[in-house]
Amino acid sequence: MKVVKIGAIWCSGCLVMNSVISKTLKNYTIDFQEYDIDMDEAEAKSYQPGDVLPVFIVMDQDQEVTRFAGEYSYDEFVSKLKEVGVIHEEDH
C-alpha cells in the first residue's frame, strides 16, 4: 500500500503536517508520495483531492482504499494508518 499526500505551499495545515509526516517516515517504512496542487497540478488533480488540504489517499495497487483530510497529531496520524493496514505494529 502507499499513501499519497496532496497539499500546497500556501496550505497552513500542510505545513503543520510536514513535521508529523517526517516523524512518521523516520519511525515506519511507508511507500509515501507527495504532490503539490499547484506545482504538480496534473498528478494532484488525477486523485480528485477535493476542497480540504492536505488530503491523504491510501492506495492499494492503484485502487483507492480510503482518504482522510486535515491536520492530525502524530499519534492520530499513525493510528489512522494502522486502521487501514498501512502500518503494522511489527513495523515499528
Across the structure, where does each feature detected by a protein language model lie?
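Non-catalytic, surface beta->alpha helical segment in thiol-disulfide oxidoreductase systems
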Residues: 57-91
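Local sequence-structure signature of Cys/Sec-based thiol-disulfide redox active-site neighborhoods
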Residues: 1-24
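Structural micro-motif
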Residues: 47-57
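Alpha-helical elements of the RecA-like P-loop NTPase motor core of helicases
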Residues: 15, 19, 42, 66, ...
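Thiol-based oxidoreductase modules, predominantly thioredoxin-like and allied folds used
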Residues: 5-8, 29-42
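A short beta-strand-turn-helix
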Residues: 1, 41-46
